[in-house]
Amino acid sequence: LHVGTFEKRKDLLTLVKAFKLFKDNTKSNLKLVLAGSKNFNGDKQVYREIKRYISKNNLIPFIIIPGYINKKQAIYYFNNAFTYVFPSIDEGFGIPLIEAMRARIPVICSDIEIFKEIGYNSVIYFKKQDYNDLYNQLKLICKDKTIVERLVSKGIKRADLFNQKNFIKGFEKLY
């Protein structure tokens, strides 16, 4: 699962390429959901490039692109996801990372600084823009249930640090 706009900085093509390797080399029946707007802040060229890649590589039956989703739909996708992947090469904060940890699903994200700060040791990192490394991390999560359990456990605790109460406490300490 990935939830976010179709923008170049989100690097969704790396995710789609990694997913292709995953489908080509495993017998998994998992599908990839790329949910998010292609219009609001979205880059239509990025969207078209991803759609072309999906079509050219016969991935249409395996990749779902529902477009913009509302809160109820987002909850559904998070509650039914096997993992959340955040391949961004640049990100301001990354709220879906926290949402995924709260939804008790393991997270795989690029090794950019903001994700290291938010995710710390509760997510799996891959080298940004490296679809082979992302593919290897996808395989790892599928093979090792103890890693999934560890990530979920740590993720729940980590996400709790980013609740409103803790934010207000931190803000009050500044002033």
Where are the model-predicted features located?
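Carbohydrate transferase catalytic cores enriched for Leloir-type hexosyltransferases
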Residues: 1-175
